[in-house]
Amino acid sequence: MQNLNPEHIKAVLELINRGPFFSLLSMEVCELRKGYSKVVLDLENKHLNPFGGIHGGVYSSLIDTAAYWAVYCDVEEDAGLISLDLKVDNLAPVKEGRLIVEGKKIKAGRNICIAEALIFNRQSKLLAHGISKQMVTPGLQTINQAVSAMGYESLPPKFIND
């Protein structure tokens, strides 16, 4: 039986959180396990629209990110994921504070994965909900390609035998 390698997860978190887009938005994936991810973001002025509330694109990016990483642990090591569809329901505006995003796998198939993500504030108020459909792409947009693009040497294997 294959189990996730905790050393791989630790290295992936370090890698992705240093990525250019995550840095641009100042978001962090802080938890990653089979079927689940957790992303946090402390709202800054750069996240706000001209009216002083959160820009809808920030909600979309957070939901897309949390959904992607919620199914990452379910795909083979040499496969990547590409978002096919993203549906976002903006349920409440927010102007400040920490956003907590929980991604949960709905289904991980051979070709298509579906996950949802919920965005909360610190008081557990639901701010946004979204669903992402992702295509499994063997050999395309793999974690090893991210390793190369960011100048890292390598990662520990994704799975270990039990």
State the predicted function of each range.
Residues 1-162:
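Terminal targeting signals and extreme-terminal segments of soluble enzymes
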